Amino acid sequence: EHKNNLRDILPDASDKLVSAIQNCEEARKRAEEELEYDIRYGIEPIPMNDDRYPQRLKDCDDAPLILFYKGNANLNQQRVINIVGTRHCTPYGEDLIRRFITDLKQLSPNVLIMSGLAYGVDIVAHRQALANGYETIGVLAHGLDDLYPRQHRETAARMIEQGGLLTEFLTRTNADKINFVRRNRIVAGMSDACIL
């Protein structure tokens, strides 16, 4: 139907031009759906030209043009560290993270702690940050309409109140393997230091 309308308006247009115009219409519709969802669920789209966009990330060549954020932490906090590692954290690793964050709180109480909300080191870091009164940001490898892994929903809900969830991905984006790699560049790009 749409193609026929375009043919009426542009009878001499090539199939390639008609297809390009239709793709623009589909993209506009998808953007409207995304914004409606974001408004309904309190998600903030933060374009790169917004003051809230992480300044450190702007310095990266492959920084996303837009981020989607749900939370209350300042993404441009003076000190930001990320804590990442294996998805199979040992009791020794858990204790090391707990002691590190507890000691860090004594030395520098205003640090934003970031990770990827994954199993293992990531979730331990987020939970210890919350337990020590730190704001913590989980950078996701999918849209904010879902959560992977689902077992971390309770922690993620607490993080929204004491930090937040951040992604470059639109809703309805699956947690595909390549997205975890893309997610990691945001975690690294926003941080002053990485604890691995």
Question: Residue ranges of each PLM-predicted region?
Answer:
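Short, small/acidic-rich helices and loops at N termini and domain boundaries
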Residues: 1-52
